[in-house]
Amino acid sequence: MEEIHRYLQPDRSQQHNFLYPLIFQEYIYALAHDHGLNRNRSILLENPGYNNKFSFLIVKRLITRMYQQNHFFISTNDSNKNSFLGCNKSLYSQMISEGFAFVVEIPFSLRLISSLSSFEAKNIFKSHNLRSIHSTFPFLEDNFSHLNYVLDILIPYPVHLEILVQTLRYWVKDASSLHLLRFFLHEYWNLNSLITSKKPGYSFSKKNQRFFFFLYNSYVYECESTFVFLRNRSSHLRSTSFGALLERIYFYVKIERLVEVFAKDFQVTLWLFKDPFMHYVRYQGKSILASKGTFLLMNKWKFYLVNFWQCHFSLCFHTGRIHINQLSNDSRDFMGYLSSVRLNPSMVRSQMLENSFLINNAIKKFDTLVPIIPLIGSLAKANFCTVLGHPISKPVWSDLSDSYIIDRFGRICRNLFHYYSGSSKKKTLYRIKYILRLSCARTLARKHKSTVRAFLKRSGSELLEEFLTSEEQVLSLTFPRASSSLWGVYRSRIWYLDIFCINDLANYQ
């Protein structure tokens, strides 16, 4: 148990990071503002304006107000008298959260750099391909098709804002910074505006997203801290029963000794009791724990996680938030794809002497499809079509030039084909392409006050050739030597390593 406590004990090497003075520096808010401009680039639409009211004059006024206040107590009965943001409460709170998020990320960056060797630090930017969303799907394709059961876990949300503050106390040793964070959360935010549990995932306020994503990721990191330890223990004790290890964690030394005795006496490897392979994936407030083990083992994992989160985080967590599903019968929305493991039947004819017989084999295959109904819902929400999938014009773009309208529609179509290049079936993409193409034509016809047929007859069909060659252009750049068999390549699944965020239309949740 001492080893467990030592492992779960946080690193104390970053205990002298005094971050509170940085909050009163003007350049911190400028860096946070520039970081937000570079990060909030939309694929569907241009950035409507990160914060046009940002200026150093507002920053100076904010810092002056912060200097003049006393934050050593939180007034619960008379909160109106303790307000220091004044009339621009929303603007100032957003600026504080951006600056604070930028400051508290410094210890994490220092910890990452110190953990890397000098060689890895020089080549840290060369590993950007691993950040691609598509890099996850080959991993699932190679590993999940051989597993049996999966735990579908809805990550528990903190029932109190103080839990979010306590998760940072191991990383940020500056008490003043933690006190300001606690004051900010309790004074200007409540739990309903921070995290809502009505949806399958978590929805954050559109303002201060970086700040709350940082708090949420820190909290999830604490929730997942046990997986690393248990995985290391299972790898170290490969010849022990991992189920028994979970139930009798106090006696793992005795179990290890018992394995040595069995191995010495029988001279065999106890392969029957080896830990089945476990794979863990987290996405959008959910997590998946897949295993090759039995239903009984997955049920033990379920109750173990519930008890751990209840005791460690004081959460009211019930077993209904964790579901055990068989992979062959499980289908889920994952990163905009509809992913499932299905049985692909195949028949083999075998002949032995004069007798011949047929052998039916069922091979598990990881399948990825485009969810057509949610995607049409996203297009309808963006005013490209109705909820039934009928294309409509986009009046807000009617004031733009014809070439710019075509370029926008073509860019959206190319991005969708690029993002869904790993789909097993491409027919859905052609329906989406038809909707966007006709929506573009109706937008242009609305601009010129004409019908679609009359406009296309007057302008020529080559006006919309942007949509005819969108996916072929992407593939010709990727596979320049495969032009002869381009159709066969296009029908296969292709995973790209340059996709770092979910497409706006694919992120329908």
From Swiss-Prot:
PANTHER family: MATURASE K (PTHR34811:SF1)
A GO MF term: RNA binding
Originating organism: Nicotiana otophora (Tobacco)
Cited InterPro entries: Domain_X, Maturase_MatK, Maturase_MatK_N
Primary localization class, coarse: plastid
One Gene Ontology biological process: RNA splicing
Record has Chloroplast as a keyword: yes
Role: Usually encoded in the trnK tRNA gene intron. Probably assists in splicing its own and other chloroplast group II introns.
Keyword Plastid: yes
Protein name (Swiss-Prot/TrEMBL): Maturase K
Family indicated by similarity: Belongs to the intron maturase 2 family. MatK subfamily.
Disulfide bonds: none
